[in-house]
Amino acid sequence: MDRAALRAAAMGEKKEGGGGGAAADGGAGAAVSRALQQCGQLQKLIDISIGSLRGLRTKCSVSNDLTQQEIRTLEAKLVKYICKQQQSKLSVTPSDRTAELNSYPRFSDWLYIFNVRPEVVQEIPQELTLDALLEMDEAKAKEMLRRWGASTEECSRLQQALTCLRKVTGLGGEHKMDSGWSSTDARDSSLGPPMDMLSSLGRAGASTQGPRSISVSALPASDSPVPGLSEGLSDSCIPLHTSGRLTPRALHSFITPPTTPQLRRHAKLKPPRTPPPPSRKVFQLLPSFPTLTRSKSHESQLGNRIDDVTPMKFELPHGSPQLVRRDIGLSVTHRFSTKSWLSQVCNVCQKSMIFGVKCKHCRLKCHNKCTKEAPACRITFLPLARLRRTESVPSDINNPVDRAAEPHFGTLPKALTKKEHPPAMNLDSSSNPSSTTSSTPSSPAPFLTSSNPSSATTPPNPSPGQRDSRFSFPDISACSQAAPLSSTADSTRLDDQPKTDVLGVHEAEAEEPEAGKSEAEDDEEDEVDDLPSSRRPWRGPISRKASQTSVYLQEWDIPFEQVELGEPIGQGRWGRVHRGRWHGEVAIRLLEMDGHNQDHLKLFKKEVMNYRQTRHENVVLFMGACMNPPHLAIITSFCKGRTLHSFVRDPKTSLDINKTRQIAQEIIKGMGYLHAKGIVHKDLKSKNVFYDNGKVVITDFGLFGISGVVREERRENQLKLSHDWLCYLAPEIVREMIPGRDEDQLPFSKAADVYAFGTVWYELQARDWPFKHQPAEALIWQIGSGEGVRRVLASVSLGKEVGEILSACWAFDLQERPSFSLLMDMLERLPKLNRRLSHPGHFWKSADINSSKVMPRFERFGLGTLESGNPKM
């Protein structure tokens, strides 16, 4: 397409290089004319390339490997052209430059290359030039970009590009050794060219002595005849064996001498192989090697060639592990799987979603329709190892899991011997003594053999294709740009596995930090798809065992045939509750949902995982679950006693300040434990709290999340609301309720649980709900606006300390509501009722309670009179 323009640019460059002295004699006019001619020719190439790039970004699917390769090729060319324009302009003194020459390079072209949004470009003043932005300091430039509406990612991307351009152009077009810049925050290909592509520009044309930084970007090997535009970029690229995947085999080529000597590079024997020079950043402890001369023959074949070079044998310093680069990214195809969430935002369109897809490689979450617009997938090397304590689970007495030993693949380079293994860190004292030993964070081999793979509390042995859930690795913010995958290169690499230990990165899944989600939850969500009985023990040439999460699920699975179902004892929005027997008396919660719907089944298994990790005296004991469709059920211990709802409304029961305090403290202990585990109850109310002989047990936590998929017969234009449910809902939830929206889409949070506890606290004092005999429409307005709560607080007389707790829990702003730990401290400040049973007033008070059915009076404590029929409430 632009071959003729490239030849013209090459001829102009040769004239510039050959007639330097004549140009100097000709004066400034000749230099200006030559610079204008060069910039004009380059601008034509830029316009042609930008037109092609615009078509690729708008008309083609960016998730396609071929499209990604073409986009990177054009972006690489455009960056080279713009930097060449800047260097041509800088070759002329500022006083001799004309207005036409100063207009190069165009700022709009630079912004388009890095994929700045059009609305941001429109806000940028027309008079602003690239030179003016280069002269600004980092803070000022970032502030201006933000003022024009640029996002944080766009600001960071442009700042890195400008920093590199400053280093190149600040030398007046003369390239020096220290002008190179290696990116530490690489970006996605859809957001602009890789930053490492720019780093090679600062090293173009430099002397060939000493080691250089290595760019890991997959720059295309072009057959361009312009030596000045291609040499500087090509000689610093890492051969990624066509696929762009950086493997240990590719790492060996960093330190491998050329198979073809420099004197024979023009001989017609066979295409030469051109390994790059060693990198200071990848191997900081390696001895310096002389820089290898770049071969110019067969340049067009280097990008599509797999070089089988023989690694050079050398000795590393004793005990020095290889340092893996943190900015290495691998370009792969998305591996989407269907997912369901309680509340999630699409990473592409930024809209809320319940059902969608998630990439198992880069953990991208989006709608199914947004996959065409999703950015390219990346797998990152995980640089640091962090230990995580293994949760203890009971042995599976119903479904024993066969955990056979599994072969392990080495991940250490051959140069590292057994004596040079890094020292292992000690595990937590609470961990299983047979747990897998971890290596130091800088070690490239964090996977070692477990001493007891058959233990019930020990997760499966890790392999290169599987993550051990006890190890968590902090991710970097983004992944480096790399060349697209090639199926041929993948198969070739796997065929060569006996020769070179290759890490199967296509099976490894990199983790990304997600706001508000622990790594354990992320693992559960990613591996909750299938039970281990339906998973294959071998997947591809590299083995991969069932995940630890799926093993946990099978250990808690109870065959429905073993459960004896009794009479129904309750009905919830998600199904019926039956009394039953399974090694004793249990409560069986049958879920009325389509078990053959994979999305619903995954959501159910996720709730099982939430139940599995709970162990507290004030939380119902989880015993297992029936997970074989169509029989889906959660089995818990049977709660004796009465619900708190019926207990406080029974006029025969006596509730003094000590008893209400004790009940509230028990509820706070259980809720505080759930919140510490990262579990939001979502349906805390007096009907879900059982009270028996002074003991409080909280039930049905988390089940509210699946109520939206259970009650599918609802009408789209109607809201079915119960009075007892509205009284426990926080204002921010009531304001989000619209017809057709499922309950699991509402913004439930820990603060919403605190609000619900406020209503329970009110019931303990007043023995009724705060709003009575009002239609649902009136309750929605009173709760959503906060007016009804203010009226209740102003009209009721419950005492200072009780009112403070109530007003704190019912705060309109969720940020002002206290945590359950603070609520416990507030309860401790309540006055205590210390009166002996032999006090004369005790018998009179008891008779008064039984006769008039009113609560005792505590005027001496300032608590006022509480009656069950108070008309003010």
UniProtKB/Swiss-Prot annotation:
Keywords: ATP-binding, Cell membrane, Cell projection, Cytoplasm, Endoplasmic reticulum, Kinase, Membrane, Metal-binding, Nucleotide-binding, Phosphoprotein, Serine/threonine-protein kinase, Transferase, Zinc, Zinc-finger. Changing A587F: Loss of ATP binding and reduces MAPK1 and MAPK3 phosphorylation levels. Loss of kinase activity towards MAP2K1 in vitro. Abnormal constitutive interaction with CRAF. No effect on the interaction with BRAF and MAP2K1. PROSITE patterns: PROTEIN_KINASE_DOM, PROTEIN_KINASE_ST, ZF_DAG_PE_1, ZF_DAG_PE_2. Residues 206-216 have a biased composition (Polar residues). The keyword Glycoprotein does not apply. Changing S395A: No effect on phosphorylation of S-392 by MARK3. It is an enzyme of class 2 (transferase). Residues 520-530 have a biased composition (Acidic residues). Expressed in brain, spleen and testis. Isoform 1 is highly expressed spleen and weakly in testis, and isoform 2 is highly expressed in brain and weakly in testis. It is a peripheral membrane protein. The active site is at D683. GO terms for cellular component: cytosol; endoplasmic reticulum; endoplasmic reticulum membrane; membrane; protein-containing complex; ruffle membrane. Changing V393A: Reduces phosphorylation of S-392 by MARK3. Phosphorylated on Ser-297 and, to a higher extent, on Ser-392 by MARK3. Dephosphorylated on Ser-392 by PPP2CA. Phosphorylated KSR1 is cytoplasmic and dephosphorylated KSR1 is membrane-associated. Phosphorylated by PKA at Ser-838. Phosphorylation at Ser-838 is required for cAMP-dependent activation of MAPK1 and/or MAPK3. ATP binds at I569, G570, Q571, G572, R573, W574, G575, R576, V577, K685, D700. The modification Phosphoserine is found at S297, S320, S337, S392, S518, S838. Residues 563-833 form the Protein kinase domain. A zinc finger (Phorbol-ester/DAG-type) spans 333-377. Zn(2+) 1 binds at H334, C359, C362, C377. The protein kinase domain is predicted to be catalytically inactive. The domain is sufficient for KSR1 and KSR1-mediated MAP2K1 and MAP2K2 membrane localization. The domain is required but not sufficient for MAP kinase-mediated inhibition of ELK1 phosphorylation. Belongs to the protein kinase superfamily. TKL Ser/Thr protein kinase family. Homodimer. Heterodimerizes (via N-terminus) with BRAF (via N-terminus) in a MAP2K1/MEK1 or MAP2K2/MEK2-dependent manner. Interacts with MAP2K1/MEK1 and MAP2K2/MEK2. Binding to MAP2K1/MEK1 releases the intramolecular inhibitory interaction between KSR1 N-terminus and kinase domains which is required for the subsequent RSK1 dimerization with BRAF. Identified in a complex with AKAP13, MAP2K1 and BRAF. Interacts with AKAP13 and BRAF. Interacts with RAF and MAPK/ERK, in a Ras-dependent manner. Interacts with 14-3-3 proteins including YWHAB. Interacts with HSP90AA1/HSP90, YWHAE/14-3-3 and CDC37. This is Kinase suppressor of Ras 1. It comes from Mus musculus.
